Amino acid sequence: VRNKVDFTLPPDVLFLNPWRDPGLRLLLEPEFVWRPMPKARITGFAASEHDEINQRIKGLIRSAVQTRTFSKAIEYNSVPVVLDKASFRKSYVQARDRLVLTGAAGNRLINRFRWENEDTLADVDQRLADYFANCSAGNEGKEIPLYAGLLDPSVPFAIECRNTFNYYHFITESLCQLTVLDGLGFEGDIYFHFPNQEERQRPFAQAYAEALFPEFEGRVFFERVPKDYNSVLSTYDLIGGHYQAPPSVIAGMNRFAPDAIKNHGGVQALGARSALSMNVVNSALLALRARALKAIEGRDFSHLPKKFFVGRDTRLSRVRHMDGEDKLFEHLEMFGFEYVVFESLSPLEQIAIMANAEMMVSYHGAGFTNMLFAGPQTYVIEIGTVQTARHRWGDFWPLAHASQCKYVNFFCDLKSENPLIEPDFQSEGLIPVSMSDKAIGQIMAFVVSLLGQYPELKSPAVVSELAKELLEVGGAEQAIGLLDKHKDMAAQNAELCLLKADCHKDLDEPKSELVALDMAHKADPTRWQTLVRIIWCANRCERPQVIRWALSRLKTDFPQRHDAFVSNHEWVRYVA
């Protein structure tokens, strides 16, 4: 009974509003609430054997890019707080009998309220929306209170855990909270509170705490809920208060949101939750990454590979074997890839292998948590399905944003009797991946091209598809290398010439871009758009004679287009 939370209570009674309700006080004034930061290059490609599934996957990718991708990632601050009359229940924390909405736990609490009340409250979503709108409006002009007293040096620090056996949840939600103690000279004990049976706890939880926070040696404890404190230090992820915050605090974020969010209530509408979780990075996560990279400085990790495929230690994980894994690795091995099981490496080795990695390949799983430690040079390649594209792709986006690596997904088929049928995710969970020979070929062509070893391809369509993939992930140089490998084919194909021009444009090489555009025009003189692009590129290269030639061709072959272009761009008349 002590561990039970009554989710039938009204939101105004159930949830703590830090701007209004007693129980939570900031230990320090936050330097910021949120701020924009560079986003990672995140891409997805369809790699199913079935056209029907590929179309579905492409639709999901398009939807994610157009309706849920912000123009910048958002860093949300995490701050130390003092909680009064704190109760750790399940994977949540209460202060003075109200649930604290903090970080991922806060998101789960909102979901839990919806599930618990969907049969009894016809308007459960509207009720939540009204609650948050009232909070936000009522909090305008207010501040979350600061702790003003002298803090007892022995006061403990406590962290809520989803569990202590899932690597992803522990690292990204719980362990990172310890970073808010940096610079505080904290002297008390630290408690991770979790709901699972003690025997289910995995060794990595203690191992990572010891490896990354050696200053707390002997003071870190794992204790099952329920647990009560009269007063305790904890972490408050300010993203948890996003929907309760004064509108003036959040409004500026809308300029980074896609139109689909701006036009449906903005970033403070509950409908934006999924997109926010994909685009927001907690400052504690960035601090954990910085601490991890500092921990490996000056150590020798030369025994670790820079190109590797990550498999699973099936004794410890929920086994999801991928059809085609052995064949894929046989091909990867020929190009210097090694087989790695993260669980067999120490915490510092796991950090180092990612920090120094050139390329990691694996299938969907908690191992992608280690993307947090990757370098900006690292290509992290995940093999998933239409299911992961729909339900799980966004889980790892914040880790890519944090590390600035290049996160690439190939969505293949489901390992099921009928891969054309997408099973119910809630009842059947994630179905393992099945890679067809075609998918293996697509992935390998991509991988080896990034390594500068270009395959010989038979059709312009296949060359074009691969070159577009390379360009999309930031591999313009490799895309040019691929097109040069097929230069005889490319010279006769306007689309391939234009692709090469796009690559040179991406690399800011306007003279080479102009050469490629000239080839594109020769390959297909019926495209007026190529001539217009030649004019713009020649202007950038300061080649007036080329501008005059292109204008002449435009006037002769496409007089209406010529007249429209000249009337809209007065500068052209001075060149002509």
Regions found by a protein language model. Give the residues of each.
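Eukaryotic alpha-helical solenoid repeat scaffolds
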Residues: 558-576
